[in-house]
Regions:
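Positively charged n-region of N-terminal signal peptides that target proteins for export
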Residues: 1-4
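Bacterial N-terminal signal peptides
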Residues: 9-16
């Protein structure tokens, strides 16, 4: 249940960011106010972590979100038309505490405990790569993965200026996405 709620919240946030990114490049020809807003949002996302707080409608507690988009994009084969970017979404709620999820703008992750693909490899700055085991959201979608041991991920991300994530994708194999930020995660 908690993973499907996080998935929904982060998916909405990622879709908004993705749409803003896509629309920002398409809207260059239109010199209007909405283009300036979209360009501003896209530039903010490219710089690093974006933070958002909201109120849980059920208990009135604060929900904290931090999201960052990869600085690189990878072109997958058909049927995916747009380049694939990766998002890291960190959420904190009163009910569930901290959770870390990665989301792909296109493509499907592979995460199967039986064939040993249920992990991603993460490298913080120039430190040695670390394996983070993953699980799929409760709704069964394969465009997002939850990282086990969010406490460790957050601790390491707080000091990192560069994060690299190598994740396995259906048909496309393992791909590396890079996240660069001038300011480290504040959590």
């Amino acid at each position: 249940m908690k993973k499907s709620i996080l998935g929904i919240i982060c998916s909405i946030l990622a879709i908004a960011f993705t749409n803003s990114c896509n629309n920002a490049t398409k809207a260059k020809a239109n010199e209007n106010d909405s283009t300036a807003i979209e360009d501003s949002l896209y530039n903010e996302i490219k710089k690093g972590w974006v933070y958002k707080n909201s109120v849980d409608e059920m208990d009135g507690s604060i929900i904290k979100l931090a999201t960052i988009v990869s600085s690189n994009a990878i072109q997958f084969d058909s049927p995916y038309e747009d380049s694939t970017k990766l998002y890291i979404c960190i959420r904190n709620t009163k009910e569930y505490g901290n959770e870390v999820m990665i989301m792909a703008s296109n493509g499907q992750f592979v995460s199967n405990e039986f064939d040993g693909t249920n992990y991603v490899t993460v490298r913080f700055d120039n430190d040695a790569p670390i394996k983070f085991y993953t699980s799929i959201p409760a709704n069964g979608s394969f465009d997002a993965l939850f990282l086990e041991n969010p406490k460790k991920f957050i601790k390491l991300a707080k000091n990192a200026k560069t994060i690299k994530i190598k994740a396995p994708f259906f048909i496309e194999g393992s791909q590396v996405f890079t996240f660069k930020t001038k300011k480290s995660l504040v959590w």
